[in-house]
Regions:
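Short, well-structured N-terminal submotif of metal-dependent ribonuclease cores
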Residues: 1-40, 50-61, 132
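Acidic, PIN/NYN-like endoribonuclease modules and their adjacent C-terminal/linker elements
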Residues: 3, 30, 104-135
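Histidine- and aromatic-rich ligand-binding microenvironments
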Residues: 7, 40-41, 96-97, 118-119, ...
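Alpha-helix capping/helix-boundary segments
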Residues: 10, 44, 76, 102-103, ...
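Short, flexible loop segments at the rims of nucleotide/cofactor-binding pockets, characterized by
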Residues: 15-18, 47, 90-94
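Active-site-proximal, substrate-binding regions of enzyme catalytic domains
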Residues: 53-75
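Active-site neighborhoods of divalent-metal-dependent phosphate/nucleic-acid chemistry enzymes
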Residues: 68-117
Length: 135
């Protein structure tokens, strides 16, 4: 089984029952889980945690038997920094935060697919990254 890193936007769609994206995200998660191992890292965990008051509630929403938790390799952290620097040099917005670069670099370094709705940024910064996106 291969691994799929699940971006926080997909998890939040389902958790918050987002009117526009919950159905797509839920279906995508189910399809990926049939053949692959769903994974998150500490950055994704932190981004999703914003919607929870208690860690116990977050833990219940992301059970370890359904979602594997992976550390971010130092190689991915280095790549994230370099890609972010390149993005800024190309005129990228200061509003763009480093977490997305950690997520993309982690998937790239460990040769995982990335399940996300934010295709444009990941494609521009990590062109070889295999994405699972809407449409």
């Amino acid at each position: 089984m291969s691994r799929v890193l699940v971006d926080s936007n997909v998890l939040l769609d389902v958790i918050t029952e987002d009117q526009r994206w919950a159905q797509w995200s839920s279906t995508a998660l189910e399809r990926c889980a049939e053949e692959d191992v769903l994974c998150i890292n500490p950055v994704i965990y932190a981004e999703v945690s914003i919607g929870f008051e208690r860690i116990e509630d977050l833990e219940a929403a992301l059970p370890t038997d359904l979602v594997e938790r992976l550390p971010i390799p130092y190689e991915a952290a280095f790549l994230a920094g370099k890609c972010f620097l390149d993005y800024r040099r190309r005129g990228g917005s200061r509003k763009s935060t480093l977490p997305d670069f950690f997520i993309g670099a982690h998937a790239a370094v460990q040769d995982m697919q990335l399940l996300t709705r934010d295709a444009a940024r990941y494609r521009s910064c990590f062109p070889k990254l295999r994405l699972i996106t809407p449409g």
